[in-house]
Amino acid sequence: PVASPRRTRLLASGWRFHLGHASDVERDFGFGRNQRTYAKAGAATADAAYAAFDDSAWDRVQVPHDWAVALPFAQPAKPAPKETADAVAAHGFKAIGRDFPQHSVGWYRLPLAIEPGDRERRTWLEFDGVFRDCLVLINGYVVGRNESGYAPFNVDISDFLDYEGGPNQLCLRVDASLGEGWFYEGAGIYRHVKQVTAHAVHVPPWGTFVRAETGAAGAQVSISTEVANDGLAEARVTI
């Protein structure tokens, strides 16, 4: 059999984690201080976003990971009136949210393994779920963001990688200050993360859709497939 041109790696181990801060820039590793967070001309995001940053004092964690579950129990500064639903109770009385900025932002770091031959290919990250607002950085550059605690998302990182043997640093800033549900929701990378490398001509994430139509005489299955060409040359392919 022919080997698949696509490689998928589960990013479960090797992560480092540290709490940031939702309102104190010093305790949030300088994030956003210089107002050039999204500058294209050069990376200027946060100290923790760069490969040279020393994260040896950070916690070692496995992903999936939820930092809220380890937080102490607490009441907010202004408890809910008795006649209204107690959202704090529904969320497990965890010390997270707008009343607890010191517990509501988390930073994750992970070095990525990149092969020199991947320069002509495409590499992206697949996140099955991060709670909640997630900023994805590669080598100090903001490459994507997602503002949902439950929707999966993908980020193409190909154009920000070092293919000459240098370090490639993945960094995530996750802000769980705002919730979505009436129930305990947690905080952090609570579902799987995958690193995918594929040929420049490939079926993108969610590029295959299967539908079935049934009737008295039987069923008809239809499959539609999207093909993306992220290379610089025209390509002829067969599906």
Residue ranges and their predicted role:
Residues 10-13, 130, 234-236:
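A short, compositionally biased
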Residues 211-219:
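Short, solvent-exposed loop/linker segments at the N-terminal edge
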Residues 1-126, 186-189:
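Extended carbohydrate-recognition surfaces in non-catalytic/accessory domains of CAZymes
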Residues 136-138, 219-239:
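Beta-strand-rich binding/interaction modules
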Residues 7, 18-22, 44, 74, ...:
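Accessory beta-strand-rich segments of carbohydrate-active enzymes
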